[in-house]
Design a protein with these regions (language model features):
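Core catalytic alpha/beta fold that binds nucleotide/phospho-ligands
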Residues: 2-145
């Protein structure tokens, strides 16, 4: 792959120059914790924390729990990047985690989340997720372009 490769040019376009990092948030969670809450609360837990799109994605996997845990961690990380935590200003479903064209995790904010983003002078939330069979981690960054 050379520096002139069109796929590199396309990738570079997703990293705009002049973007400013405003804040970050991180969260780590044990997959077993998410699984235990799900086993106790089932649909109530899913509806309270995850959008339907997130549920559909996670339950399309042979083991949905690492994927649910990663999204749980992502929501916590996003709320921490906003310096609000989960609560009145930012709810569990204020953001939805989905995949972009290169399967990169992306954040979709609801109107409440968009208003909070704008009020903080940010234009975008970027995230990264990772998980093993036992642990999930997410980092969120508020940026202004």
């Amino acid at each position: 792959m050379s520096a002139e490769d069109p796929s590199l040019t396309e990738l570079a376009a997703t990293f705009p120059s002049g973007a400013m990092l405003l804040n970050i948030g991180v969260d780590v969670i044990e997959v077993e914790r998410v699984k235990k809450v799900y086993e106790r609360q089932k649909e109530r837990f899913l509806k309270r924390v995850f959008t339907q799109e997130e549920q559909d994605y996670c339950f399309s996997k042979s083991n949905p729990f690492p994927h649910l845990a990663a999204r749980f961690a992502a929501k916590e990380a996003v709320s921490k990047s906003f310096s609000t935590g989960i609560g009145k200003l930012f709810s569990w479903t204020s953001c939805s985690i989905y995949h972009g064209p290169r399967m990169q995790p992306l954040v979709r904010l609801d109107e409440q989340g968009k208003a909070l983003l704008k009020s903080l002078g940010a234009t975008e939330v970027r995230i990264t997720l990772s998980h093993t069979k036992t642990t999930a981690v997410a980092v969120a960054a508020l940026v202004n372009q």
